[in-house]
Amino acid sequence: MAKIRTDAPVMPPETPPRSSEVGEIDTRAPFQSVRDALSLFRQVSFSKKQPPRLSSSSSSQSQDTTTDVSDKEMQLLLAEQEMDRVKICLDGSVAAKAQALSDLDSAQRKAADLRVKLESIKHSRKCAISTKHTMNQRLEQLQSENQETESTREDYILITAELFMAKYELAELKQQFNLSVEERLAELQRAEEAECASMVNSNKIKDMSHDIAEMRDAAERLNSDAARKKEEEEQIKEESIALRETYVCKKLEAKQRLEDLKRDCDPELKKDIEELMEISTENERLQEEIKLSGELKEAKSAMQEIYDEESSYKSLVGSLTVELDGVQRENRELKGKEKERQEAEEGEWVEASRKVDEIMREAEKTRKEAEEMRMNVDELRREAAAKHMVMGEAVKQLEIVGRAVEKAKTAEKRAVEDMKVLTEKKESLTHDEPDKKIRISLKEYEELRGKHEESERMVQFKAKTVAAQLEEINESRIEGERKLEEKIKEMEELKAAIDGALRKAEIAEEAHSIVDAELRKWKPQDL
C-alpha cells in the first residue's frame, strides 16, 4: 500500500499538529465547526495580510475611516470567498471522509474476510497436516503390515518348500513302500515255499519219527528176543547142567553096574563094553557139543544181526536227528526272519503312518494358515478400500482447501487492487486538494506492508504445502495400490501353490488309506 500524506494547513487550537503519527489513517474532520473554521480563517488572513503600521500619526481620521471601511469590505469579501472555499473544502473533505470511511469499512471487511479465510486456511492446513500425519501413520502401519506380509510370504514360501520336500519324501516313501511291498511279497512267497518245505520236512519228520518208533519197537522186540534167547540159553544151560547131573548120576549108576558087570563078566567083554561105553560117551559128548555149538552159532548170528540192525537203526536215527535239527534250525531261522520282517514292516508302516500323519497335520496347518492369510488379505482389501475412501476424502478436502486458497489468493489480489485503487483515489484527492491530506505513520505503513507480504508468503507457502501434500498423498495412494496389487498377486500365487499342495496331500492321504487297507488285508493272511 502507498503512503498518503494530507497535512492540513490549519489545525484547531485544541489539536496540535502531529508530524508522524503511528496508527491507522487519520480520517478526522479538519474543523470541529464552522465557527472554528471562520476564526481560523480570520486569524490566518489577518496574519497574512496585516497592513503595515503607519509611521506617522498625523493621518487624518477620514483616511482612517475610508481605509477601515475599504479594509473591512475587502476583508469581508475575502472572508466570504474564503468561506466559500472553506465550505467547498469542507464538503470535499466530508465527501472524502465518507469515501475514506466507506473504503476503510470495505477494507476492514475485506481484511476480516481475509482473516477468516486465513483462519480457514490455517484450519485446513491443520486438517491437512493431521490428515498427512494420519496418512503417514497409516503408511507406516501399511509398511509394517507389508513387512508382516513379506515375512508371512517368506513363511509360506518355506512352508511350500517344506510341502514340496514332504511331497518328495512321500514319493520316496511310496517308492520305498512299493519296494518293501515287493520284498514282502517275495518274502511271503519264500515264506510260503519255506512253509511248504517245512510241511514236507514235518511230514518227513513224522515219517522218520514213525520209522524211528518202529525201529525202536523192532529194537525192543530184538532186545526182548535176545533176552528170551538168553533165557532160553540159560534154561538150556540149566537143562544141560541138569542133564549132566542126571548123566553123571546115570553114569555113576552105569559105572556101578559096569563094575558089577565087570565083576560078573569076562575081561574081554568087559573091555568091549568099556570101549563101547567110552565111544558112546564120546559120541554123546560130541553130539552135545555139536548141538551146543550150532545153537551158539545160531544165537551169535542172530545177535550179530540184531546188533547190525540196531547200529543201522542208530545211524539212521542219528542222520534223521541231524536232519531234523537242521530242519528245525532252518524253521527257527525262517520264523525269526519272518518275525524280523514283520517287525520291520510294522516299523516301516508305523513310520510311514507317522510321516503321513505329519504331512496331513502340516497340510491342515497350511490350510488353516491359508485361511488366515485369506482373512488377512480380505482385511487388507477392506483396509485398502477404507484407505482409498479416506484418501479420496482427503483429496476432496485438499481440493476444497486448494479452491479456498485460490479464492483467498483472488480475494487478496482483489483487496490489493482495491487498496491500490483506494490509494490512487487518495493520491488523486491529495493532488487535487493539497490542503486535505490524511496522515499515516511510517511504522503503520511498514506493518501493513509486512502483514501484506507475510500473508502473501503464508498463502504461497500454504498453497505449495497443500500441493506437495496432495502430490505426496497421491504418490502414497498409487504406491499403496501398487503394493496391494502385488500382494494380491502374490497371495493368489501362494493360494494356487497351497491348493496344489493340499491336492497332493489329499492324493497322498488316499494312497496311504489304500496302502493301509492292503496292509490290513495282508495281516490276517500272515496270521
From Swiss-Prot:
Coiled-coil ranges from the UniProt annotation: 95-159, 202-389, 436-513
Region (Disordered): 1-28, 46-70
Keywords of this entry: Coiled coil
UniProt keyword Aminoacyl-tRNA synthetase present: no
Annotated InterPro entries: Web (IPR008545)
Biased composition (Low complexity): 55-68
UniProt keyword annotation of Coiled coil present: yes
Disulphides: none
Protein family according to the UniProt entry: Belongs to the WEB family.
Protein name: Putative WEB family protein At4g17210
Species assigned in the record: Arabidopsis thaliana
